[in-house]
Amino acid sequence: MVAAVDAGDLEEGRLILGREYPFTPVAKSSRRYTDRQCLRVFYRDGFLDRYSGTKLVHPAALRALSVIMPGEFPAHPNWLMSQSHFAFWELFPTIDHLVPVARGGADEESNWVSTSMLRNSAKAHWTLEELGWTLSPPGDYTQWDGLSGWFTGYLEANPDLFADKYLARWYRATVHTRGEYRLSATTHPPN
């Protein structure tokens, strides 16, 4: 292609590029997930990072610890790394697209996996093959629930924490999702 361009034949360069390495635009779609959608994926995956197999912790369990111990376990509302405990990057679960949407992957549950914020940032728009990563099998939420049972039980025992809108919102979503999975609000799986 470059040889054709150097020879002044832009049309031939375009043809070669289109044939051997074409640009395929992907429609941009906005992605926003409800707390319940996130929790369904986290429970389905057993609160495991599907890229590393590492245990993840319920988002509001981490935030509750930050509310209780802000000096020792700080969390910045806008994820400022210099003002947040590193656990928020290592252990905080998020949804990632196994096949990136930017690369043509579908924004649907069959293409969603649980991962940490850290690995989500590292993966970005790359495929597992490009990174040399593999997909770990899902965990079992009856063995590890990401401290969901602890979180709901702690809020129930400390109702003043319901004043925190983030914690209250995640509490409602967690109780609902645990109901879908037939877990009591405060059942703790073995660790």
Please annotate each region the language model reported.
Residues 55, 118-122:
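Cys/His-rich metal-chelating microdomains
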Residues 1-30, 133-137:
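Mixed-charge, low-complexity interaction segments
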Residues 152-191:
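Short flanking/linker segments adjacent to small metal-binding domains or redox-active Cys/His motifs
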Residues 14-80:
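Short, charged surface segments at domain edges that flank catalytic/cofactor-binding sites
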Residues 49-50, 113-117:
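Cys/His/Pro-rich metal-binding microdomains
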Residues 77-94, 100, 142-166:
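Short Fe-S-cluster ligation motifs
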Residues 54-112, 126, 133:
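Histidine-centered nuclease catalytic patch
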